[in-house]
Amino acid sequence: LGDVYKRQNMDRRKFIKTAGLAAGATLLSGIGLAEVTTEKTKSMKIVVLTGSPRLNGNTNHMASQFIKGAEEAGHDVYRFDCTRHKVAGCIGCNACGMNGDCFMQDDFSELRPHLLEADMVVFVTPMYYFGFSSQLKAVIDRFYAINGRIKGAAKQAAFIMAYADTDPKEAEPMVSHYKTLLNYLGWKDRGMV
């Protein structure tokens, strides 16, 4: 039984990695990153927030493929691996006033200037108990400190998710969260995979 599981798991992983390449290409074409460069406009500054602790997992593989395509299209990409950085969740103290510095001294201070300058933010996460990974969620919660500067800003966003299920309904809570976040921030959705 163990050998059967390993073979099925490896087949599934191979399929997902291959599908990740196709999905990345689909997302890139749906987002229009290639067209942006040919329209004689400046390249975009893109922040990719990854939320998977598995370096060689499907989520990070899809993120890498997206980044590769975006860079080949001439865009400037900054990758922030939420699981490799120490970012505490927001405690709601309001010391930042939603438009200032957060009193917590951690790796969010490294990400902050990139988020403020970004034309696009890409959220990449595995599904953990029908939600974003806790590491990515902690980073999103810290958006509170820069809310006054990113809400209503002319930013775009995309969502890339991996999950081990065949029922699309299982992804609905995460898709809903992503759409609600973008609606609140006033950002334009450029695609979901």
Regions found by a protein language model. Give the residues of each.
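Glycine-rich phosphate/pyrophosphate-binding loop and the adjoining helix
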Residues: 24, 179-193
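N-terminal export signals
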Residues: 14-35
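Short, small-residue-biased leader/transition segments that mark boundaries at the very start
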Residues: 1-5
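N-terminal beta-loop-helix "entrance" segment that forms/cooperates
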Residues: 82-100
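Helix-loop-strand module that forms the ligand-binding subsite of alpha/beta enzymes
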Residues: 103-185
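C-terminal segment of N-terminal export signals and the immediately downstream linker at the start
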Residues: 7-10, 31-62, 72
